[in-house]
Amino acid sequence: MAKAKFERTKPHVNIGTIGHVDHGKTSLTAAITIVLAKTGGAKATAYDQIDAAPEEKERGITISTAHVEYETKNRHYAHVDCPGHADYVKNMITGAAQMDGAILVVSAADGPMPQTREHILLAKQVGVPAMVVFLNKVDMVDDPDLLELVEMEVRELLSKYGFPGDEIPIIKGSALQALEGKPEGEKAINELMDAVDSYIPQPVRATDKLFLMPIEDVFSISGRGTVVTGRVESGIIKLGEEIEIVGLKDTQKTTCTGVEMFRKLLDEGQAGDNVGILLRGTKREEVERGQVLAKPGSIKPHDKFEAEVYVLSKEEGGRHTPFTNDYRPQFYFRTTDVTGTIKLPADKQMVMPGDNATFTVELIKPIAMQEGLKFSIREGGRTVGAGVVTKINN
């Protein structure tokens, strides 16, 4: 049979399975592909193909992630599944696999477990907008009261971490029954995909967001002025539009008088484009790498924030020793390093390599930032951690 071509006409959503070890995340991922393959919406992918996830590097950190794709009537999905707990922590903090939504897998036989909690908390911290629950292994539970109890526990846990626990769809089923082709197993998978389709919101496309471009380089072109280059992160920039230069120094206003790509002049640059932007009346020395160009008023510079951070283990090339309060590494945001001081919470004496932790950072210079911004922590040019801004402190 010829391989069906995925139609890119449907809206695209990135999703992932999260939850405690052995609750059935990978079995569920396999079951989704096998059930959807029957209607031509996926290539059936077996458990062991997904479980042998390839290693990828994201900002100097090795993460094992399996990617599968499938489609429903309404959407095209890219789905990530990680083999180990540490891979999830790294994946969510680095944003290696951006998640527009998640499927939280909970074993009906065990109920919520420590990693269930940790994944819900991480999802909240890194800004996963919505999730749907799959209560797995219901074929192993004979008592309907027990099922109801587990569902209540899951809803309470979601509410505790700031998700709407009462509203979130909880689908009960068995990934194993679906893999075995049993009708009740398949029915639950179809119900789950309907819930994901309707409950996980459609993400805003990068071009529909406000304009932002991290500055990578600055040139002076005689007779024309100053050109900054970089990749447009979000939004669209048009000729004649007023923009702000934000970060490192006081915010300045300027006007875009030219957009150039591959030596051709354009009317506009949009998300994903590598462009040069000509700035009216801006001097070469007033702009530098590490600042951003942005729509006026859309982003502010900050130097104090709270972060969720994964610290590399020694085996991953990280530090060999823990760090303590007032540790001063470099924080790499977008295109530049800024020195900062780490302030640990009162109850935390130190952070060990291989741990994830929450702490406050004070930078020596402000950076254009918003919650959800990713960064690396570096020491002597090597990456020792990866983090995400969870809260800005003014």
From Swiss-Prot:
Mg(2+) binds at residue 26. GO terms for cellular component: cytoplasm. It is found in: Cytoplasm. Its EC number is 3.6.5.3. It comes from the Bacteria. GTP binds at residues 19-26, 81-85, 136-139. The keyword Secreted does not apply. Keywords: Cytoplasm, Elongation factor, GTP-binding, Hydrolase, Magnesium, Metal-binding, Nucleotide-binding, Protein biosynthesis. It catalyses: GTP + H2O = GDP + phosphate + H(+). Residues 60-64 are annotated as: G2. Belongs to the TRAFAC class translation factor GTPase superfamily. Classic translation factor GTPase family. EF-Tu/EF-1A subfamily. PANTHER family: ELONGATION FACTOR TU, MITOCHONDRIAL (PTHR43721:SF22), ELONGATION FACTOR TU-RELATED (PTHR43721). Monomer. This is Elongation factor Tu. The lineage of its organism: Bacteria, Pseudomonadati, Pseudomonadota, Alphaproteobacteria, Rickettsiales. The gene is tuf.
